[in-house]
């Protein structure tokens, strides 16, 4: 059970169809209730590349929505991340790790087939069952509660209901001066 809420409108999300929710924390389940939602571009902090999608924005306890891959995929001439070839910063593992370092409650990666290099079926087949991780001394400090993916059309609708333009923000996210954007009145609940 998962949903976005924007103002008084709920956007229900069916597991495996619009969203895939998972966790690598110990235990049977996790739950988020009305967590604020922030668009964090590509969710990358790479000081050696003079890139920081988070700037000084506090995302502790929030769900961040991020784009898959890195900024060069759609605009290889930027050459910030070595062109179209995906760097570690573009991988889902990095995005979850960086969000955990920043105290985010969850991460929602917007799935798009070309920049991910695989279709939605791969996401659902890979993330719909139990997830396993090594035993960690302090798993809660190293993992976000919720790791998830959503279909692009769900992201577009969410942003629209929040009064934002997904494509315009996606273009802004390819710039070094991008700053995270809170989705006005938007929250996420799910388990």
Give residue ranges: language-model regions:
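Acidic, His- and aromatic-enriched active-site or binding-groove loops in soluble protein domains
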Residues: 130-139
